[in-house]
Amino acid sequence: MTTDTPPPKPGLTYAEAGVDIDAGNTLVDRIKPAAKATSRPGVMSGLGGFGALFDLRAAGYADPVLVAATDGVGTKLRIAIDTGHVDTIGIDLVAMCVNDLVCQGAEPLLFLDYFATGKLDVAEAATIVEGIARGCATSGCALIGGETAEMPGMYAKGDFDLAGFAVGAMERGGALPANVAAGDMILGLASDGVHSNGYSLVRRIVERSGLGWGDPAPFEGRTLGAALLTPTRLYVQPALAAIRAGGVHGLAHVTGGGLTENLPRVLPEGLGIEINLGAWELPPVFRWLAAEGGLDEAELLKTFNAGIGMALIVAPDRAEALADLLAGAGERVAVIGHVTEGAGAVHYRGTLL
């Protein structure tokens, strides 16, 4: 009695497993011009190597200290994915990293991104990376490398995730915060909307409202999705100009935790902050979120930027000149408070709502 030998199973390929290396190579070729456009003094290599090279001396530094920051965009990505509007989400990614760097007194020099998805859509990924490149160019930092990860089975169809990593530098002795003292004034720079924090609550409020992303926003003329995808403002160049002008003792990027949690991060022991909530107008998007979500003022101030995206703590005798400098650079500036004697908390005077 003979036993039939089963035919051999056909060989598998990586592409059949769901990973298209050719698509990845196509993406790299497509984004090279955008990355090249961000080049700056110090860049020694382009995309495609095993690592990226940067020459700090060529960038003008004599005795540099490096500063690194990494971040993502959070669940704002969900709105970008659901609406298909992904052209500015890369700007958010850059802003979340480089705005943090400048708070340490550092000039952003280079940026790397991580893009992960279940199935690579070259056109979509290129649009996202081109947004990253625009953010880098605005901030004066080079998009020097990155990683595109196509991972079948790890993400739902159409979903993706982003992470960014930025490196900056300052000359030794230039780190901030420094010399923060009672009586220092706080300059608030206006935000361009919700920026990139609090979106889990935003999405819950939108769900409660019964509105869709394509419906008109109740607080402005665009669709709700477009309004909520307004990219995070990049404060790097105006903030660096203020630092170089002298008198800046500290900066706080107002992200998750709002003014309530972020301002104390730049305070030494024994000092507090008083904020005058009447110093600026609460933007309509936050007024709508508060009303629709039933948020009290404390929740609003601890979750969202509430209209102030960056705060600078400055010497009192430099406040007016620095406010003029920042306004001349295109920022909307308000004197929103001052540093006080006391233990590390933020105290609010007046009301926003």
Swiss-Prot record:
GO terms for biological process: 'de novo' IMP biosynthetic process; adenine biosynthetic process. Pathway: Purine metabolism; IMP biosynthesis via de novo pathway; 5-amino-1-(5-phospho-D-ribosyl)imidazole from N(2)-formyl-N(1)-(5-phospho-D-ribosyl)glycinamide: step 2/2. Its EC number is 6.3.3.1. GO terms for molecular function: ATP binding; phosphoribosylamine-glycine ligase activity; phosphoribosylformylglycinamidine cyclo-ligase activity. CDD domains: PurM. It comes from the Bacteria. It catalyses: 2-formamido-N(1)-(5-O-phospho-beta-D-ribosyl)acetamidine + ATP = 5-amino-1-(5-phospho-beta-D-ribosyl)imidazole + ADP + phosphate + H(+). GO terms for cellular component: cytosol. Pfam families: AIRS, AIRS_C. It is an enzyme of class 6 (ligase). HAMAP family: AIRS. This is Phosphoribosylformylglycinamidine cyclo-ligase.
